A protein has these predicted regions:
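HhH-family (HhH-GPD) DNA N-glycosylase catalytic core used in base-excision repair
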Residues: 1-306
Length: 306
């Protein structure tokens, strides 16, 4: 079963999805030249799907293929997930109009035109990924996460390729911390991941409540769990729930980007970053992603990689 999505507003698909291989392999989100593959759970079973695209940022077309799907709800669920992965419901056009008043963002928009933040489809996947990324660089975080996905995820075949479904909470709730340690997760990170999984399985952490809560409610619920700090909670708000008025000001990469673009390389306090970001209102999430992408462009030109 195939479907074509016409995109309203600018979308640079390749740039938007590039994070899925910018720092290494992601077996749950396989990006190759011109194709993206992932697995989705529908009606109690896993389905692999493929996303391909054509056109430029102003006339992008997305083609979604779900082999063997015979029910409309399978395709509907897949299309909804693709919308999240490509950030299609984010108001980029409004952000561009607002960015014109900020010299830094106004200069970045033409260079990054059509970039949209990807939204992680599954809350548990987002939380585990955030724990893996704590206090390490993203290349190492992706390496460790890939090992975890291959060990505990479910291989799903489709479109001539295999993609791994991200491990479910019930599976990681039974994982041994020692086994996670052998994947080069620290003991504490292993404990955090198993702990979050067990909270979800037991019902102590209700993921549906997170989507319905205010920003501060979400921060309060997540930071009450061992191993999840405000940094993790704010990235969850930004990259899973798609909240616009969020700036993960404590994140090291965010702090470096603000220092580079707004303070001649000198560090800014978390409070100062939040104060500046507040000027962008509902566009904070998009602004932060453009600053981070702009910082990576600068590093690449300077020969510093990502």
């Amino acid at each position: 079963m195939d479907e074509t999505l016409l995109v309203a507003g600018p979308l640079d698909v390749a740039r938007t999805l590039s994070r899925y291989r910018a720092w290494g392999e992601d077996p749950a989100n396989r990006l190759t030249d011109g194709a993206f593959r992932r697995a989705i759970r529908v009606d109690g079973g896993w389905r692999a799907y493929e996303l391909t695209w054509s056109g430029g940022p102003d006339d992008a077309k997305l083609r979604v293929s779900v082999p063997g799907a015979r029910r409309a709800r399978v395709l509907d669920a897949t299309l909804a997930e693709v919308r999240r992965l490509c950030g299609l419901d984010l108001d980029v056009a409004s952000f561009y109009r607002a960015a014109a008043a900020d010299p830094v963002l106004a200069a970045l928009v033409p260079r990054l035109y059509g970039l949209r933040p990807t939204l992680v489809p599954e809350p548990f996947e987002m939380l585990v990924g955030a724990v893996c990324a704590q206090q390490v660089n993203l290349t190492f975080a992706f390496t460790v996460r890939a090992r975890l996905v291959r060990r505990y995820g479910t291989p799903v075949r489709g479109n001539g390729a295999t993609v791994y479904a991200f491990p479910e909470p019930a599976v990681l709730a039974r994982a041994r911390v020692g086994d996670l340690r052998r994947m080069q997760l620290t003991v504490r990170k292993g404990e955090y991941i198993v702990g979050v999984a067990r909270q979800i399985v037991s019902g102590a952490l209700d993921l549906s409540r997170l989507a319905a809560g205010s920003n501060e409610d979400v921060v309060e619920m997540l930071t009450a769990i061992r191993g999840l700090g405000r940094w993790t909670a704010e990235w969850f708000l930004a990259r899973c729930l798609g909240r616009g008025d969020v700036c993960p000001a404590g994140d090291l990469a965010v702090r470096k980007a603000f220092a580079h673009f707004y303070n001649r390389g000198r560090a800014l306090s978390e409070r100062a970053i939040r104060r500046r970001a507040a000027r962008w209102g509902e566009h904070q999430n998009l602004a932060v992603h453009y600053l981070l992408a702009g910082q990576r462009l600068h590093a690449e030109r300077a020969g510093g990689g990502s």
